[in-house]
UniProtKB/Swiss-Prot annotation:
HAMAP family: SfsA (MF_00095). It comes from Pseudomonas putida (strain GB-1). It comes from the Bacteria. This is Sugar fermentation stimulation protein homolog. Gene3D superfamilies: 2.40.50.580, 3.40.1350.60. One of its GO terms (molecular function) is DNA binding. Belongs to the SfsA family. PANTHER family: SUGAR FERMENTATION STIMULATION PROTEIN A (PTHR30545:SF2).
Amino acid sequence: MRFFPPLEQGRLLRRYKRFLADIELTSGEQMTIHCPNTGSMLNCMREGGLVWFSRSNDPKRKLPGTWEISETPQGRLACVNTGRANALVEEALRAGTIAELAGFTALKREVAYGEEGSRIDFRLEFDGAPVYVEVKSVTLGYPDTAVAAFPDAVTQRGAKHLRELAKLARQGVRAVQLYCVNLTDVEAVRPAEEIDAAYAQALRAAVADGVEVLAYGTRLDAEGIVIDRRLPVLLNP
């Protein structure tokens, strides 16, 4: 995935009201941009740190800029636009990069399923047999470790998705939880039990019920993002 037009650079002044961020451009101009991330963005940003944003020419938009990449306190880069994860995964699926899911004959997005009113990110078909794939974007890193963690805030919705996947797996349907790690310098992923113990428990229960768990890392810079390698998932770090 290439950023076009190219991203612009600034420095973070503050993030507030969840969806807003004030930045200062290299010219010294200050502007408010949209923050497309509903999470806490823990360890994902710092005041004065570099940010990169895309700019829209749509006159109907109240805020023309969208925050895409952040410099973390550890000096990593994180793609904070969570909406990019599904597009990245679809790109990788169609390219055959995710070997465990290669060879599908059909792909549908945002398909309704389950007993709790969920929508699956991807429903693949392999010779008529469905495979359900739920995607989560991982951006939480810690100092002095190359292990990223998910989630960065309590997520009842994430636990619900795991329950739905587990129900499918118990019925003999292939179900996959896929973590798209949009953070540089990462070698593995784990559940963030210190933030959401219920989610970590739900993940381990889902695996016990037959849900497959995959994690893929990305190569990320201000020019683009691409999924490029599988990462281990540490269920009991």
